[in-house]
Amino acid sequence: MNRPVRRGAALAASAAALAAGLAACSLSGGTTAATGGTVILVTHDSFALSDGLLESFTEQTGYAVKLVAPGDGGALVNQLILTKDSPLGDAVYGIDNTFSSRAVDEGVLAAYTSPDAVAGMDTADGHLTAIDQGDVCLNVDHQWFAANGVAEPTTFEELVDPAYEDLLVVTNPATSSPGLAFLLATIGHFGETGWQEYWRGLLRNGLLITEGWSDAYYVDFSGSEGAGPRPIVLSYSSSPAAEVGDDGVARTGNVEATCVRQVEYAGVLAGAANPEGAKALVDFLLSDAVQADIPGSMYMYPVTDVDLPAAWVEHAPLAADPITLDPAAIAANRTAWLEEWAALLG
């Protein structure tokens, strides 16, 4: 995961205040009896919750929480597979829909879905519970396009037009979670026989590819605190909320047709030393307190119907019709797609 960490003070304060007000609430369901002991949560390195939330879980259940973070989302799943005979912990958070099938197929997860799981969201055959969601989208710098008299792009296809030459920066799908999501979005949009030619067109039109999100967004993009030359960047649907000025106007926006949905899950690890504690923690991640805290702490959207910060509602809604791919298809083809993509670059 490489998520925006810069956000408006009002946004962070409102999310923290809402979470603090809810933190004293009991869990909405699942395992709540105080039993004691420690539950180890294995997670990616972007996991964060406001002060006091994990402490409230301990007060409610008796379980202390220890965190283990082996890396980003891809590294997380790889480490779970490598250590499945001697699990790193009891529960896991941060497996997303691009890796969920692989985690299940490799046998790293026990069968458990929270009784509070949101209806209609994938459970990986009863092994995972959706906790948060978001969209990876192209973002545009409104001010740049207005100042240069160029229409903002609204489709994938426009980006290979000479009018947008040298304007786009994305991240490497082999080294970046959003980069992989964008590659999958192009496969979902153009199909398995059309995406390669689309990427050739992007490359001919001056596409810049960076290794990570931070460089693309803060160095090469013109619409954030960097002074980069490129007004189109691969980022997140939530990013424009962090770019709202004191005047209440968003300096950036999403190209909604390019948005691809990302869902993050929690589950119980097979062979967990404390499976009951793990179940209780999975349930807790769906509590109102945690769900309300997710936007301000992890810059993702909750999966339940808790209120979003006002800036998100106005400037950074989830896409109404995002691109989605079957997790099993991703698991079966990820390596081949990445190899084909690398071959395009020569």
Where are these regions (language model features)?
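A structural signal for short loop-to-beta-strand junctions that line the ligand-binding cleft
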Residues: P87-V92, A110-V140, E157, D166-P173
